[in-house]
């Protein structure tokens, strides 16, 4: 499944709680700006759904946090 990842999209946990917004996209990775906690990177394969309004994505329960990708396009 291909996702139109772009800054500003909301990011939700598998339970439906908003955890932040996409701050940056590098290739198949995106950075989540999470209020009250450090920002983190997630790989697009960890997305399980998009919101009906196409303004957000939901992450898998076991989504892994990654270091910033160096040379992703």
What are the roles of these predicted feature ranges?
Residues 1-73:
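Peripheral interaction segments used for macromolecular assembly
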């Amino acid at each position: 499944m291909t996702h139109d990842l772009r800054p500003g999209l909301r990011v939700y946990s598998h339970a439906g709680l908003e955890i932040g917004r996409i701050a940056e996209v590098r290739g198949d990775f995106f950075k989540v700006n999470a209020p009250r906690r450090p920002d983190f990177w997630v790989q697009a394969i960890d997305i399980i759904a998009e919101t009906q309004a196409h303004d957000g994505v939901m992450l898998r329960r076991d989504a892994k946090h990654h270091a910033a990708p160096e040379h992703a396009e």
